[in-house]
From Swiss-Prot:
Annotated ranges, domain S4 RNA-binding: 15-81
SMART domains for the chain: S4
PROSITE patterns: PSI_RLU (PS01129), S4 (PS50889)
Active site (record annotation): D139
One GO MF term attached to the UniProt entry: rRNA pseudouridine synthase activity
Name this polypeptide is given: Uncharacterized RNA pseudouridine synthase Rv1540
Source lineage: Bacteria, Bacillati, Actinomycetota, Actinomycetes, Mycobacteriales
Record's keyword terms, sorted: Isomerase, RNA-binding
One Gene Ontology biological process: enzyme-directed rRNA pseudouridine synthesis
Entry EC no(s): 5.4.99.-
Similarity comment: family membership: Belongs to the pseudouridine synthase RluA family.
Catalytic activity annotation: a uridine in RNA = a pseudouridine in RNA
Amino acid sequence: MADRSMPVPDGLAGMRVDTGLARLLGLSRTAAAALAEEGAVELNGVPAGKSDRLVSGALLQVRLPEAPAPLQNTPIDIEGMTILYSDDDIVAVDKPAAVAAHASVGWTGPTVLGGLAAAGYRITTSGVHERQGIVHRLDVGTSGVMVVAISERAYTVLKRAFKYRTVDKRYHALVQGHPDPSSGTIDAPIGRHRGHEWKFAITKNGRHSLTHYDTLEAFVAASLLDVHLETGRTHQIRVHFAALHHPCCGDLVYGADPKLAKRLGLDRQWLHARSLAFAHPADGRRVEIVSPYPADLQHALKILRGEG
């Protein structure tokens, strides 16, 4: 904790503690009120409540929490993460499951940027330090192709391409049951789940979300789909197909059958970023990068095909 002490200025006399503290330290009123409620604010050595009034000349003492350590993408060799394509502007990786795109609060596992750093890639684009080069992301539990910008030119061009939806993003998803129709479009807005802030759901006031799909192969208990995302919302494929009562196999968060997941040997959702196609940021030529299925997804398909 860091201590701050100061006399109350005349101009703040009579003001509520949370309001005056917010003005003095540049905090939000909510943050200032929280400090008072935690007993971290004193006036002349006496704990002050958030609604107490400031007195001119009184000694205001505040215990501030230490600033969190900056997020770091720790360089580490990542088993199974291979380079699918690389040049002076971009690098495309085959991201394994259980790997995050970049460092974030609460995540202590490996990251794509950490793996690239360990492999000798130097990324110095603009943007927040722990997200340098990141132009799109994949869920931790989703495997497949992910492109990272190395040059500032690529970062600018690809950020714009993803924003304006000129990147062709194809996923393969193994879902429970058989969607009807076998090919179609899901147009349903996605927002935060009301009961679980770490989940998403179809919500009336959610963000516009559009998913196109075609059935590639039908099994007794599941269907393999080719999915084309027109938008790119967090958990979009998982939420859309769960809403149709066809969750991704293995996706227990969104209602998948745990018995089927166990039978298929899945400990994560069967969802794979199969390909990305876009105009190269340097010369505009079309680049298409394809990722093969990892072993766990191949194993699940082998079991299903054996049951046919």
